[in-house]
Amino acid sequence: MTIFEGTFTQDPSTLRFAIVIGRFNDLVTDKLLAGCQDCLKRHGIDVNPHGTQVDYVWVPGSFEVPLVARQLALSGNYDAIICLGAIIRGHTPHFDYVAAEAAKGIAAVGFQTGTPVVFGILTTDTMQQALERAGIKSNLGWNYALNALEMASLMGQLRGQVTPNNSQASLPVSQMKNPMISE
């Protein structure tokens, strides 16, 4: 029996990512992006905006993220797409509509295109909760990037582009720790 699990044995220079960032609540999304970039960089990805491995796309808010993610996925140029945003509950039902449609839209992009699309949109009740998840206590941007790395590796294996790693030399993604979380 073959076991497939995302690993980091693939040459990182062959991977390409797109990061779609909602500008609304940029106090939060800027921090998520920094965590994302830190993780990718530590795993050998060139995060320079003028480089060839990561493309950055800014959109007005989380509602617009799925449309742009779909267009990027359809290009076939990316091993994974990371979607970042922050939706903070207010006093109207607007939060519920935006959060639900962003989640459904991002999931649909992955299903329709076969490209891994990471849901990195925070949905919180308060700005404080969002900031805690974007850097005060931990930075979930790191986790979203790690998810993208794992899924890019896993989908590569499932597509037959990369053979599963049976050696003990590499650490499976499930055993990696996020250095940005204070325990």
From Swiss-Prot:
Its Enzyme Commission number(s) read 2.5.1.78
At the top of the EC hierarchy, this enzyme's class is: transferase
Q: Which GO terms describe its biological process?
A: riboflavin biosynthetic process
Coiled-coil annotation: which residues?
none
| Keywords from the UniProt entry | Riboflavin biosynthesis, Transferase
Q: Cite the InterPro entries for this sequence.
A: LS, LS/RS, LS/RS_sf
Q: In which pathway does it act?
A: Cofactor biosynthesis; riboflavin biosynthesis; riboflavin from 2-hydroxy-3-oxobutyl phosphate and 5-amino-6-(D-ribitylamino)uracil: step 1/2
Tell me what reaction this enzyme catalyses.
Answer: (2S)-2-hydroxy-3-oxobutyl phosphate + 5-amino-6-(D-ribitylamino)uracil = 6,7-dimethyl-8-(1-D-ribityl)lumazine + phosphate + 2 H2O + H(+)
Among Pfam families, the record links this protein to: DMRL_synthase
Give me the residues that bind (2S)-2-hydroxy-3-oxobutyl phosphate, please. 133
> Which SUPFAM superfamilies does this one have?
Lumazine synthase
Q: Which domain of life is it from?
A: Bacteria
From the Swiss-Prot or TrEMBL record, what is one GO molecular function term?
6,7-dimethyl-8-ribityllumazine synthase activity
Q: Where is the active site?
A: 94 (proton donor)
Which residues are 5-amino-6-(D-ribitylamino)uracil-binding? 24, 62-64, 86-88, 119
Q: Name one GO cellular component term.
A: riboflavin synthase complex
Give me the segments passing through the membrane. none
PANTHER family reported for this sequence: 6,7-DIMETHYL-8-RIBITYLLUMAZINE SYNTHASE (PTHR21058:SF0), 6,7-DIMETHYL-8-RIBITYLLUMAZINE SYNTHASE DMRL SYNTHASE LUMAZINE SYNTHASE (PTHR21058)
Protein function:
Catalyzes the formation of 6,7-dimethyl-8-ribityllumazine by condensation of 5-amino-6-(D-ribitylamino)uracil with 3,4-dihydroxy-2-butanone 4-phosphate. This is the penultimate step in the biosynthesis of riboflavin.
Q: Which family does it belong to?
A: Belongs to the DMRL synthase family.
Name of the protein described by the UniProt record: 6,7-dimethyl-8-ribityllumazine synthase
